[in-house]
Each structure stands twice: as structure tokens, then as C-alpha cells.
Amino acid sequence: MFVCSLCKVQCVCFEKLASSIENQSDTSSSLRRIQRFISLYSLDKDLIARLIFALLPNDPPYSIAIDRTNWKFGESNINILVLAIVYQGVSFPILFKLMPKRGNSHTSERIEIMERYIKLFGRETLEYLVADREFVGEEWMQYLNFNRIEYHIRIRDNFWIRNPKNDKQFKV
């Protein structure tokens, strides 16, 4: 009920969530229940991912995007690796990994989030992966190729590409 209210209200304001819950209780009672729930319960991230996946209006396979966001909150660095399903130009974050450091993700972190997606939803639900230019590297590309994951990755203008058919290199 709580997660459905989050989707309905599209915010995390407890008062708005409480007023959106359709039941016989008073809004203040719903608010206290939400506060108790948040303070006592640890949400299962995989369960939330499955719920979001089930609520998507279209059937798989899906395009997925991987991205990273980094900002400072006071003295704390917040760095999150996100895997999202892209549907009609909108990205729905489905999996994330908090990274205890600043800067780009490592290949192992990317593989971990991809493996989690495949474990939860299956490889067949993935049409292709979209990523920005920070998501490159030989080991990462080998992982994607080995697992037959089609990808569209922006690359830097100073990159050299090797054509596997004739082994010739050319600058992008």
C-alpha cells in the first residue's frame, strides 16, 4: 500500500502519502503508521525493483540505461550507480548501488548491478543497454560481449576503434 501511494502521489512527503491512502482511517492515523513503518522496516530493494518492473505498462524486452550521479550533502559525498528501464523516453530507476567513494564506477560495480538485473528479471527482458562515455573499458566491453548484451555507449572523440573484421583501427 505504501509503495503504491508513492507511485500515486509521486513524492515522499509523508503528509501527502497519508492523505492518498484509501482506507477507513483518519489521515493522521495513516501518517503515524507511515512514520512507524519507515522507522521500523527495512525495505527490500529487490522487492521494490520487482514491483516497479511489474507496474511498467509495456511488455519486455526493455532498453535499459546505466548512469551515475554524484553530489555533496554537507561533508558527505553521495555517489549512486543507477540502472533504469527506459520507456517512451522516461527512465524508471529500478536498481541502484550506493558507492562509498567519489568518481567513476569500477567495472566490478557495473557487472554487479547488471548481474542483479539479470538474476531478478532474466537476460531475455533486456533489449539493449545505453550508457554515457564513462562506462567504457576493456573488461566491461568483454563482459557485455560475452553475455551478448547489445550496447549503445557514447564515446570520447579521441577514441580509436578496431574493426574486428579486418583488424584496422580508425579514430572516432
Region roles according to the model:
Residues 15-17, 37-51, 70-80, 159, ...:
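Short, charge-rich amphipathic segments
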Residues 1-60:
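Electropositive nucleic-acid engagement tracts
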Residues 96-172:
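An internal, acidic/charged active-site-proximal segment
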Residues 17, 63-70, 83, 91, ...:
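Short, conserved catalytic/metal-binding motifs centered on acidic residues
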Residues 27-29, 54, 59-121:
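RNase H-like nuclease fold core
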Residues 1-16, 76, 110-111, 116, ...:
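Solvent-exposed, charged interface segments at domain starts and junctions
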Residues 6, 23, 37-41, 71-72, ...:
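Short secondary-structure transition/capping motifs
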